[in-house]
C-alpha cells in the first residue's frame, strides 16, 4: 500500500534530498549533484559536489546553503543512501531538531509526488550536463534559476512566485514579458541564450516523462 507523507504546513518545513551521480568530472572536481527540493513549493537547490566528499563536508554544505537561507526544516525525506543513514548525519539532524524520513527500497512511493519531481529534475540535469561535459557545474546556477522560474502544474505557478508572492523580475526574462530592454553586454546576451537552451531541455524532459507516465497508466487500465 502506498505510504503518503503529510502535506507540509509552511514553505520550508519539509525537504527532499537525493544525489544525481555518475556525471563527467569537471575542472573543479565535481562529479555529482546534490538535489534538495522543498516539498510544498517545489523550489530547489542544485549543489555540485564530489561523491567522495565525507559526510562532515556534505553537512557543512547543507548548513551553508540550506540552513543559512531557509532555517532548519522540520522533516527531511531521503532514500537510504549510506550518507543519509550515517551516525554523523543522524546525530546532526537530531541536534538540529529535524526528523528524518527514509523511503524504503520496497516502498519508494513514500516520497509520493516528490519522487516524480526528482526524476524530472534528474532528466533535465543529465540532459544539460552531458552537453556541457567538463564545465557543467558552471551552468548549475542557471539551471536552478530556470527550474525555479518555470511553471509547475502541481502548484499552478512558478516555485519563485510561491516563495515570494510575485514572479521573478530579471533582465533574462524581459524579452518574454514584452518589456523593452537593450541587452547590451555580451554576458547578458550569452546568459539569455543559455537560459533559453535550458528551458528547451526542460520542456523536452517533461514531455518524455509525461509520455512514459501516460504509457504506464494506460498499461494498467485493462
Which residues make up each language-model segment?
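Integrase module of LTR retroelements
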Residues: 1-222
Amino acid at each position: 500500500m502506498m505510504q503518503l507523507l503529510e502535506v507540509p504546513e509552511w514553505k520550508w518545513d519539509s525537504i527532499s534530498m537525493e544525489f544525481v551521480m555518475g556525471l563527467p568530472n569537471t575542472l573543479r572536481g565535481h562529479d555529482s549533484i546534490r538535489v534538495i527540493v522543498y516539498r510544498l513549493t517545489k523550489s530547489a537547490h542544485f549543489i555540485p559536489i564530489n561523491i567522495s566528499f565525507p559526510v562532515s563536508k556534505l553537512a557543512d554544505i547543507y548548513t551553508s546553503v540550506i540552513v543559512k537561507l531557509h532555517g532548519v526544516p522540520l522533516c527531511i525525506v531521503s532514500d537510504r543512501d549510506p550518507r543519509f543513514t550515517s551516525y554523523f548525519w543522524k546525530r546532526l539532524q537530531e541536534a538540529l531538531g529535524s526528523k528524518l524520513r527514509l523511503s524504503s527500497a520496497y516502498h519508494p512511493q513514500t516520497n509520493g509526488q516528490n519522487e516524480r519531481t526528482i526524476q524530472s529534475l534528474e532528466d533535465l540535469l543529465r540532459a544539460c550536463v552531458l552537453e556541457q561535459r567538463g564545465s557543467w557545474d558552471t551552468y548549475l546556477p542557471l539551471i536552478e534559476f530556470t527550474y525555479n522560474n518555470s511553471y509547475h502544474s502541481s502548484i499552478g505557478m512558478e516555485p519563485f512566485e510561491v516563495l515570494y508572492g510575485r514572479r521573478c523580475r530579471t533582465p533574462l526574462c524581459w524579452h518574454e514579458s514584452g518589456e523593452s530592454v537593450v541587452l547590451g553586454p555580451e554576458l547578458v546576451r550569452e546568459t539569455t541564450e543559455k537560459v533559453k537552451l535550458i528551458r528547451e531541455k526542460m520542456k523536452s524532459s517533461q514531455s518524455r516523462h509525461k509520455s512514459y507516465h501516460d504509457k504506464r497508466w494506460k498499461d494498467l487500465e485493462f
